[in-house]
Design a protein with these regions (language model features):
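Generic secondary-structure boundary/loop-capping signal
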Residues: 30, 47-48, 137, 156, ...
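Divalent metal-dependent catalytic cores for phosphoryl transfer on phosphate-bearing substrates
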Residues: 41-42, 52, 70-178
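Extended, charge-rich intrinsically disordered regulatory tails
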Residues: 170-173, 179-195
Length: 198
C-alpha cells in the first residue's frame, strides 16, 4: 500500500491523531492518489502529479504560516495542513492515472472531494470537531479558481493562495523547460491570465 497522504503529513509535525487519520485515508485512497495527475494539461499533468502538486502546495502553506504568524493565532495549524493535503483528493475520480478524464469528471474534484470526506465525517470530527470538519469542507469547496467576494474561511483563503501559486509556477516551469529555458523574444504567455513575461 502506498501512503502518500501520511508521508506528506509526516513532514509537518502533525499530531498523532491527524497522522492516524491520514493513514486511514491512505488505506482507501493511497494507491490511486499516488498514481493520479493533478490536471490534464495545465500543471502537474502526469501520473503521480497529484502528489507533487499536493506536496508543493503544502510547502507554500507552511511558508505562509511561518512568515505571517498572525495567521497561526487565527487558525488551527493541524487543520490547515490536513486541509492542504486533502484539498484535491477529489481529483482521484476526476482524472485517471493515464492522464485522461475519469468516470465522474463532470462532477468536479470539488464535489468528489467533499463526498470522499463525508465518508470519513465521524473520524474527522473526532480529530477536529464538527466546526473543523466543515472548515475542511470549505477548503475543498472554495480553494479552486478565482477567489470570489463571498464568505470564505481563513483556511480556504490560505490554501487557495498556495494552490494558485503552485499551479502557476508549475506551469511556468514547464513552459520554460519546453522553450529550452529561454524566453522567446516576443515573450512567454502565461496561461493563467493575460500576462506575458520577458
Amino acid at each position: 500500500m502506498n501512503s502518500p497522504l501520511y508521508s506528506i503529513g509526516s513532514e509537518y509535525y502533525l499530531s498523532k491523531k491527524v497522522l492516524t487519520l491520514l493513514r486511514k485515508l491512505d488505506e482507501q485512497y493511497g494507491n490511486i492518489f499516488s498514481e493520479s495527475p493533478a490536471a490534464l494539461r495545465v500543471h502537474d499533468a502526469y501520473p503521480g502529479g497529484l502528489v507533487t502538486h499536493t506536496r508543493n502546495v503544502l510547502r507554500f502553506v507552511d511558508v505562509i504560516l511561518n512568515t505571517y504568524p498572525a495567521t497561526l493565532t487565527c487558525v488551527n495549524r493541524n487543520l490547515v495542513i490536513f486541509s492542504s493535503i486533502v484539498h484535491d483528493i477529489g481529483k482521484i475520480t476526476e482524472y485517471t492515472p493515464e492522464v485522461t478524464r475519469g468516470k465522474y469528471h463532470w462532477f468536479s474534484h470539488l464535489g468528489s472531494g467533499i463526498e470522499i470526506m463525508s465518508r470519513h465525517k465521524e473520524d474527522i470530527i473526532e480529530v477536529f470537531g464538527e466546526e473543523g470538519y466543515y472548515r475542511i469542507l470549505s477548503v475543498i469547496q472554495q480553494h479552486h479558481g478565482e477567489f470570489s467576494e463571498s464568505c470564505h474561511t481563513l483556511e480556504s483563503y490560505i490554501v487557495h493562495k498556495a494552490d494558485m501559486l503552485e499551479a502557476q509556477m508549475s506551469k511556468l516551469n514547464k513552459d520554460l523547460a519546453d522553450t529550452g529555458y529561454t524566453i522567446p523574444e516576443d515573450g512567454l504567455k502565461i496561461e493563467f491570465g493575460k500576462y506575458k513575461v520577458w
